[in-house]
Every structure is written in structure tokens, then in C-alpha cells.
Amino acid sequence: MNPREYQLNKMPIQSFVKLNLNKEGAFKMNISRKIEFEQLRDRKSELFDKEVLNILNGQVMYEEFKNEKLMGDSDYAPFNEAMCVNPATTQVFDEDFIKTRAEGHNSSVESYTKKVIDPLEKLFTKNYKCIVLWFGEDVFCQMNLLTILSHLEQSVYEGKVYLNSFREDEFKVNQIELELGKYSSIYNEVLVNHKKTSHKVPPVMYQAIDLFLEMLTEDNAVMKFISKNKDLSTQELLTKLFHLFPTIGYGDTQYIELINKIKKK
């Protein structure tokens, strides 16, 4: 089965959080049963202690995990980025990275640091025996995941690394242990140089890279859809885009930027 067939035949994993657009257009999060976490504790009780850091894809997910102590006494940190858009630099989280990413988001360095870098302080300052990454299969999540993995390699992290993905349709946490060694190179190829990777990667990441590179083109499927439906309101377009392109995983910010770009033409 090639990656395209794999992607078409498999529901995208949405990394624990089920996002719905409510009547006001704001996101609300449906947190599923805690029983899965109890089962996870039975299988991997060592992941619930103080020497473990959970890195979560976004602030909403982070707050829910932290407030509910879903992973027991372990630490939590959010990665509040959208690495699937805007330029990136080879060295992750250094001064040049921060400046480049801030400019891409039309943000000040101070504002970017407060939103993205400061919440990751535990990752930079504490030594953990294990880091658990909570990221899904869509492009948004996979590019964020790739960035964190690149940082772990660049910082010569020596502990264990687990990836926890969540299947929205049946609420099952899918856990695999990752071996560091190639992700900084993959990150550089894909997110810095915008090329396909020369490394062998899982079908999920292969497909995400493929879609990421496709989204860099002017005539990608999302842009075509917006162009054909530009008479719809932004809110109507957002609702349709979230429904039609789950494998992209963009949030409202990324889509609104594309919508405005096309409507201004």
C-alpha cells in the first residue's frame, strides 16, 4: 500500500482533541473518557511520574491535560506553533529561529517568545528521563512534531521518547517509542529547504510531508476550493474547510490568511 492509499483508507488522527466549530465560531473541545488514560497507566505506569514531560500540540490541549492531571504527576508543556506555515531555520529555538518565526507570524519577538518559547521552559531547563509527545497525523501536527524531534536531537537528549496519537473515532491512544537520529536532517530537508526527505519515514509522516509541500504551491486543493467559493462568507468557508480537509489540520488563523489572500485578488 502506498502512502496515498494509506491516507485515503485511514481516518486522520487528531491528537486527542476533537475540535468543533460552535455557533459563535469559536472552538470547543470535547474531552473523551478518562478510561483510556487509566488503561495507559496500567500499561505504562512509569509515564505518570515526575521525571516525565508531556509536550502537547497547543494551549487548549495543554490546559486540559494539566488541569485534569490526565498523566498523573508528570509535567506538561504546550507547543503553540504552526510550523506548517512560514519560513523556518536550521537551528530550532535559537535567536535566529525566534526572529524568523516571529516575522512570519507578523509578531514581535517579545510576543512570540511569550507565546511559544516561554511555555516550553521545562523542556529547556529540566532533565527528564522520558518525553511523551502528543501529536496527531495531520500536516499541522506532523510539522510541529518534526520540529520538536529536531530540537531533541540538536540538544542531544538521551532519554526515551514516546509519540502518543489519538484516534478520534474510537478513542484509542496509539503509543510508539521513537528512536532519535534522523529527524533534524528531515526537518532541515522539509521545513527549511522545502524538499522531500531522503530518509525513510512512516507512511503518516510521508503523507504529511507530501501534503505540506503541496500546500506551498499556488494551485493547491485548498486554494482552488476557496477560489471557487470565494462568494461565501469567511465563516461559511471556514466551516467547509475544516470538514473537507482534515488531513491538513489548519486552524482558523491559517485558513483566514488564505481566504483573505484570495478575496483581495
Q: How would you describe each model-predicted region?
A:
Residues 19-109:
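A structured, charge-rich N-terminal accessory region that forms the first stable segment of a protein
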Residues 55, 130-139:
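Acidic beta-strand-to-loop metal/phosphate-binding motif
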Residues 63-67, 88-89, 141-149, 172-175:
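A short acidic (Asp/Glu
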Residues 68-71, 125, 146-158:
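Short, surface-exposed basic-aromatic patches at helix termini and helix-loop junctions that form
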Residues 76-83, 154-173:
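Conserved beta-strand -> loop -> alpha-helix junction used to position metal-binding or nucleic-acid-contacting
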Residues 106-122:
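Glycine-rich, highly charged phosphate/nucleotide-binding loops
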Residues 173-241:
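A conserved mid-domain beta-alpha-beta active-site/ligand-binding segment of alpha/beta enzyme cores
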Residues 229, 243-265:
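Charge-enriched amphipathic alpha-helical scaffolds
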